[in-house]
């Protein structure tokens, strides 16, 4: 009930999208209840690498709930299983912790491991690498999402600068 109240407050304040943490034991029943209470809200879930490809049936059920994306559902270093998952569901997979370098991003794009990429400049080696990842994603027609990791004001400014590029 507390979660539903917080979501109601966010919806009332006009937040365009709501991100929910999704983990074993706090997953499908919770998400179904949220969707039932807020049928028109835009949600995405962040799994923080909490699942494996053996949970494919769970993600097929999540697919029915019409989410904007599923962020980092599987282990961060398993781009192959992310590709298998993305081919098996219609909801876009967004890679986050998997994107630690330009090379990792290029490999994810090559394997079709996702349909969104969350770029964190602090994780990928700074703004120059973040822009290279953005450009590779744009060329592959994969939209980007910018995230932060509790940066300083300088780091936050990098995130804002990056978010102004055309593929965000």
Roles of regions detected by a PLM:
Residues 9-21:
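Catalytic domains of carbohydrate-active enzymes, especially glycoside hydrolases
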Residues 20, 25-157:
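Catalytic core of soluble alpha/beta enzymes
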Residues 167-168:
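Short helix/strand-capping turn motifs
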Residues 2-6:
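Active-site glycine-rich loop that binds ribose-phosphate moieties when present
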């Amino acid at each position: 009930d507390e979660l539903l109240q917080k979501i109601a407050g966010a919806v009332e304040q006009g937040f365009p999208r709501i991100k929910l943490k999704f983990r074993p034991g706090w997953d499908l029943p919770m998400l179904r209840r949220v969707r039932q209470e807020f049928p028109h809200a835009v949600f995405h879930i962040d799994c923080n690498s909490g699942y494996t490809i053996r949970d494919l049936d769970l993600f097929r059920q999540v697919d029915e709930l019409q989410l904007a994306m599923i962020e980092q559902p599987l282990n961060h270093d398993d781009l192959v299983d992310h590709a298998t998952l993305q081919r098996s569901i219609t909801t876009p997979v967004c890679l986050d912790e998997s994107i630690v370098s330009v090379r990792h991003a290029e490999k994810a794009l090559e394997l079709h491991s996702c349909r969104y990429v969350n770029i964190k400049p602090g994780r990928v080696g700074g703004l120059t690498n973040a822009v290279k990842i953005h450009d590779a994603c744009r060329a592959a027609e994969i939209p980007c999402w910018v995230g932060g990791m509790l940066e300083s004001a300088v780091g936050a400014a990098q995130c804002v600068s990056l978010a102004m590029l055309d593929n965000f």
